[in-house]
Amino acid sequence: MFQDAEEKPRTLHDLCQALETSVHEIELKCVECKKTLQRSEVYDFVFADLRIVYRDGNPFAVCKVCLRLLSKISEYRHYNYSLYGDTLEQTLKKCLNEILIRCIICQRPLCPQEKKRHVDLNKRFHNISGRWTGRCAVCWRPRRRQTQV
């Protein structure tokens, strides 16, 4: 489909423009499991501001299940260290709102309120493969392990 590296769109919006289609109609396969993404997974991919990858010139995204699995594997294999918000600002000499911090689980970029929540609750941000992670509001909630009576 796209052979030249220069012409390969990296975002889903750019890919839709190149293919003259919309986010609501495009069909992409998962780069890991090769299944076609569900519509909600396509929207999640856009919302998380993830990048398209290419295999043999064809565009691929990643499904929700594979993304969570890859995030967990990356956390185990490439964890470097953790810092509190204030220390992170001092280390990078930037305000938290200027630092790209993604959710450690779903990879969505954290908004200023989610970053503030980490600071207010004295939670750390984690450096994994040189990228900063925390938890978004959706993934922050603990999951119930069993039915409570």
UniProtKB/Swiss-Prot annotation:
GO MF: DNA binding; PDZ domain binding; zinc ion binding
SUPFAM superfamilies in UniProt: E6 C-terminal domain-like
GO biological process: DNA-templated transcription; regulation of DNA-templated transcription; symbiont-mediated perturbation of host apoptosis; symbiont-mediated perturbation of host ubiquitin-like protein modification; symbiont-mediated suppression of host cytoplasmic pattern recognition receptor signaling pathway via inhibition of IRF3 activity; symbiont-mediated suppression of host type I interferon-mediated signaling pathway
Short sequence motif PDZ-binding domain: positions: 147-149
GO annotations of cellular component type: host cell cytoplasm; host cell nucleus
InterPro entries: E6, E6_sf
Disulfide bridge partners, by residue number: none
Pfam family, one: E6
UniProt-annotated location(s): Host cytoplasm; Host nucleus
Keywords on record: Activator, DNA-binding, Early protein, Host cytoplasm, Host nucleus, Host-virus interaction, Inhibition of host innate immune response by virus, Inhibition of host IRF3 by virus, Inhibition of host RLR pathway by virus, Metal-binding, Modulation of host cell apoptosis by virus, Oncogene, Transcription, Transcription regulation, Viral immunoevasion, Zinc, Zinc-finger
Zn finger (unnamed) start-end: 30-66, 103-139
Family: Belongs to the papillomaviridae E6 protein family.
Subunit text: Forms homodimers. Interacts with ubiquitin-protein ligase UBE3A/E6-AP and thus forms a complex with human TP53. Interacts with human NFX1 and MAGI3. Interacts with human IRF3; this interaction inhibits the establishment of antiviral state. Interacts with human TYK2; this interaction inhibits JAK-STAT activation by interferon alpha. Interacts with host DLG1; this interaction leads to the proteasomal degradation of DLG1.
Function: Plays a major role in the induction and maintenance of cellular transformation. Acts mainly as an oncoprotein by stimulating the destruction of many host cell key regulatory proteins. E6 associates with host UBE3A/E6-AP ubiquitin-protein ligase, and inactivates tumor suppressors TP53 and TP73 by targeting them to the 26S proteasome for degradation. In turn, DNA damage and chromosomal instabilities increase and lead to cell proliferation and cancer development.
Miscellaneous note of the record: Belongs to the high risk human alphapapillomavirus family. The cancer-causing human papillomavirus E6 protein has a unique carboxy terminal PDZ domain containing substrate.
Protein name as catalogued: Protein E6
Organism: Human papillomavirus 58
Classification of source organism: Viruses, Monodnaviria, Shotokuvirae, Cossaviricota, Papovaviricetes
Gene name of the record: E6
